[in-house]
């Protein structure tokens, strides 16, 4: 197979990719069997002359002969695909079915691989199936009726179900492509296999997770909703069972824990049961919203649909010399909305979400500042307490009814006069209250944001416009702790307990969590014998 990199094609070119390749490399005319687009990125640095940059795999007749003709082409090389390592099975017998805690990306992929290989896992998900959950979330957003066990954080698909559905990851691993192909089989658009920054949107994610659940069940797995694991039964430092919903006992010697970063009561239970964990850094801040046209103009210089491009994205970083902290954009959602994402009564949490089409006309992103144990303490649960403190203050500022505190950039920066939130663009439901965001974030966060906003305004025109709305608070950027695990991914303090995914501190996003769940299941199978 031949790999071609850095193939630059103007977005206005309408030729077939095969014609483009043969025009660029005439040595390939008549020799091409198949072309696979591995990656397609957008380069808008010289706007409005925007180009796609392709990486391709090309299968040809007489590869050795063709490569001799192309030997001086630095962007063309022979490529040998690295396949995922084959799954091997251990010889330790399983007296009971393996248990999976949580049905987010990590738990879902762990259960999927276990079921595919005949291990018949039982999944316990505290939240509801995606259809019931979607109704509960819509009711919360429209009416402010909150359900602590069925919300944006808990339920089928995990927190990612109500997000932009980004499938980007900095991780490189042969199994990622295999997982992506499964996602396409279950309803994701085929473009996720090659787009530089693929996304599926919350609408397609809901279809995907349901289809994956049905396949797990078809393969002999079981998925139980409204089923929270409330305790572990441990003998001689090893798992022997789990308690479900405070009463039911399920015997098992293997628990794969894919709980999310918002399962705080589960964190407390696991800490009580001596599961090793340590505090780790994360980031907190606010959501900022702009008219999507402002971002499109800055990034592309033209209206994107005229060139067949989607809503523009951005990624921003600011290194603060005064404090040594870093502010950055996080989970940017083009054409999306800011959503209420609480998982507990008495706290306001915001996040971003968009549909596959990204066509709301409003761009939003978290803008956050790093925090760590030096700020909140070194006890494993100190980060949770820190998050709760600022979420509670946001809840009270908003009126103690899940309305969120919001403020314009002009008000936040102390400009006079400054537009009010009522005259700005905002999308958070059930509603916002014009408040001082300095009252629901630590001073060492707000001071950095005050310096970051003008800096970013010099990079994206209009980013720090005084009328732009910011809504608080964003506190769930990543897990506030990390659970220990050894080379086999087992907890060093509780045998048979496998921490995995974002909630355990080993992933940051849908794809990395899915991969961590799959690889954890594969290592588990390498120890335990395949059931007859």
Residue ranges and their predicted role:
Residues 1-52, 56-162, 166-532:
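Residues forming the flavin
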């Amino acid at each position: 197979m031949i790999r071609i990199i850095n193939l630059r094609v103007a977005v206005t070119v309408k030729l077939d990719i095969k014609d483009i390749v043969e025009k660029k490399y005439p040595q390939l005319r008549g020799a091409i069997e198949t072309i696979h687009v591995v990656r397609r990125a957008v380069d808008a640095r010289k706007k409005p002359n925007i180009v796609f940059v392709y990486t391709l795999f090309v299968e040809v007749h007489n590869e050795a002969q063709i490569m001799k003709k192309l030997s001086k082409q630095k962007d063309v090389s022979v490529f040998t695909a690295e396949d995922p390592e084959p799954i091997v099975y251990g010889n330790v017998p399983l007296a009971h079915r393996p248990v999976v805690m949580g049905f987010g990306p990590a738990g879902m992929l762990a259960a999927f691989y276990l079921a595919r290989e005949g291990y018949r896992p039982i999944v316990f998900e505290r939240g509801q199936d995606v259809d019931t959950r979607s109704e509960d979330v819509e009711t919360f957003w429209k009416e402010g009726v909150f359900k602590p066990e069925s919300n944006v954080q808990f339920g089928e698909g995990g927190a990612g179900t109500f997000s932009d559905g980004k499938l980007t990851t900095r991780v490189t691993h042969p199994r990622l492509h295999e997982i992506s192909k499964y996602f396409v089989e279950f309803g994701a658009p085929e473009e996720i296999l090659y787009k530089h920054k693929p996304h599926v949107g919350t609408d397609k994610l809901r279809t995907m997770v349901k289809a994956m659940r049905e396949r797990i069940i078809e393969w002999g797995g079981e998925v139980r909703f409204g089923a929270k694991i409330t305790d572990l039964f441990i003998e001689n430092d090893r798992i022997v069972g789990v308690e479900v919903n405070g009463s039911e006992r399920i015997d098992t010697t293997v628990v794969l824990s894919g709980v999310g970063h918002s399962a705080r009561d589960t964190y407390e239970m696991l800490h009580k049961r001596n599961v090793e964990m340590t505090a780790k850094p994360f980031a907190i801040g606010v959501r900022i919203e702009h008219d999507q046209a402002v971002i499109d103009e800055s990034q592309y210089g033209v209206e994107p649909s005229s060139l067949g491009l989607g809503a523009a994205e951005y990624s921003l970083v600011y290194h603060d010399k005064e404090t040594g902290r870093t502010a950055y954009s996080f989970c940017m959602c083009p054409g999306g909305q800011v959503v209420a994402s609480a998982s507990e009564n008495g706290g306001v949490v915001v996040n971003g979400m968009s549909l596959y089409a990204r066509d709301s006309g409003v761009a939003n992103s978290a803008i956050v500042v790093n925090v760590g144990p030096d700020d909140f303490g070194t006890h494993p649960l100190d980060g949770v307490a820190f998050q709760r403190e600022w979420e509670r203050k946001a809840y009270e500022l908003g009126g103690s009814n899940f309305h969120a505190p919001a403020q314009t950039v002009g008000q936040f920066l102390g400009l006079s006069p400054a537009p009010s939130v009522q005259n700005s663009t905002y999308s958070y439901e059930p509603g916002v209250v014009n408040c001082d965001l300095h009252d629901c974030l630590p001073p060492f966060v707000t001071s950095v944001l005050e310096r970051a906003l003008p800096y970013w305004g010099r990079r994206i025109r209009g980013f720090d416009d005084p009328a732009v709305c910011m809504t608080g608070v964003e506190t769930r950027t990543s897990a506030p702790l990390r659970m220990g695990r050894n080379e086999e991914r087992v907890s060093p303090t509780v045998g048979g307990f496998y921490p995995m995914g974002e909630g355990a501190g080993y992933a940051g996003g849908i794809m990395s969590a899915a991969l961590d769940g799959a690889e954890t299941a594969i290592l588990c199978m390498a120890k335990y014998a395949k059931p007859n």
